[in-house]
Amino acid sequence: KRPFEGSVVVAWPCTRATEACLRACPAACTCSSVEQGCSVRCDRAGLLRIPAEFPCEAASIDLDRNGLRILGERAFGTLPSLRHLSLRHNNLSFITPGAFKGLPLLAELRLAHNSELRYLHARTFAALGRLRLLDLTACSLFSVPERLLAELPALRELAAFDNLFRRVPDALRGLANLTHAHLERGRIEAVASSSLLGLRCLRSLSLQANRVRAVHAGAFGDCGALEHLLLNDNLLAELPAAAFCGLRHLRTLNLGGNALGRVARTWFSDLSELELLYLDRNSITFVEEGAFQNLSGLLALHLNGNQLMVLSWAAFQPGFFLGRLFLFRNPWRCDCHLEWLRDWMEGSGRVAHVPCASPASVAGLDLSHVVFERSLDGLCVDPEELHFTTYSPLPSPEPVATTVSRFSSLLSKLLAPRAPVEEVANTTWGLANTKLSDSLPSCGVGVLGCKVTFVFLFFLLPHLGGHGKET
């Protein structure tokens, strides 16, 4: 009996917790007992205000997709066990300072997709000292009060993309425990040297799809722990020489979809642990020697979608590039300067799809199919730049009238009245394929018409000759 009695004693607290969870469940919600307490689901319930009471044991409350507009002070009462609170896709326009008081253990707060929530008071998140994740996605925020996040010393992750920020919020500075910051798809125009001060634990920063035109020197100076930096799809045309200096733990750097015209050797000098480098969809025409020399651990380099005609092996020396290289959608000139790349493609199998744009003799071929000839002294010979001429087997178009053709036509008209119809036809046809002298009629003695014709032609020829020069 002892094992049976013991099992009843163990199950009794669970039963009591389930009963308490169901007993205090709001009418429009569903509640269930979970390992950490009580889960309350009020999503899509058509609520226009916060329920007056929640189970005291509530560990998670979901109020997504309702019609909530305002959160008053202590909007949720006192819930000592609450760890997860979600208010996404509502119509929140104002949150009273102190609305989240009474939630001492709250670790995740999701306020995403409240498009009317355009302003937050500096004391909005007061008393949330345990908060680790804050989601402010798509809230139409123009700015964040500088002291707003200072009340959140434990904050690890901030999601604030799809907002209207024009600069990196000053509120981020000094968040010593922040590890992830999502600021993509906004209107941020620059990363200033003071934007990221004090973020010594930051491991992931996303600024993609903003309007960033400038990254100031030293902007990432305090971010030595950064592992993933996304700056793709912005308006960057240039970077400072030591743009990423000190980021020795960086593993992913995405600079794709910008307006960069060159790749400098100083940009990546400190990135010895970099694994993924995206430089695709830029306007790059030149890569400096040694630009990738320290990237010996690189798994993939994306240079596709640029304006590269040549890529020197010196860009990778003295390091040794081991990863995959993506080079498609570039106007490659497949001459001897790319012979090393052709050999590498054959030997490693880690480079593919390098279509040639020139010289003409290999245009349209993939570089892997180009055969480089050798001179007598063993040097590489560039493929020929062919000059094609057009040949058509069809009859040529009617030529432009010349002096001879005009003269022949005039002569035919002069002689036509004195010849039978059949002779005129034959004479006109023959003029196109004979010399001028052969085209003149045979003039016998005493033929007055012929003499008059010659006199006329004597005065006419100089005029026709001058006109022919102009044509």
Regions found by a protein language model. Give the residues of each.
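The feature encodes a structural signal of leucine-rich repeats
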Residues: 47-52, 72-74, 96-98, 120-123, ...
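LRR N-terminal entry segment and analogous cap-like coil->beta motifs
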Residues: 34-75, 79-82, 88
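Conserved hydrophobic beta-strand positions in leucine-rich repeat
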Residues: 40, 59-63, 82-87, 106-112, ...
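Leucine-rich repeat
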Residues: 48, 54-57, 69, 77-81, 93, 101-106, 114, 117-118, ...
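Membrane-proximal C-terminal cap and juxtamembrane stalk of leucine-rich repeat ectodomains
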Residues: 1-25, 31-37, 323-470
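Consensus "Asn ladder" position of solenoid repeat domains
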Residues: 45, 66, 90, 114-115, ...
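Solenoidal tandem-repeat scaffolds enriched in leucines and small polar residues
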Residues: 115-238
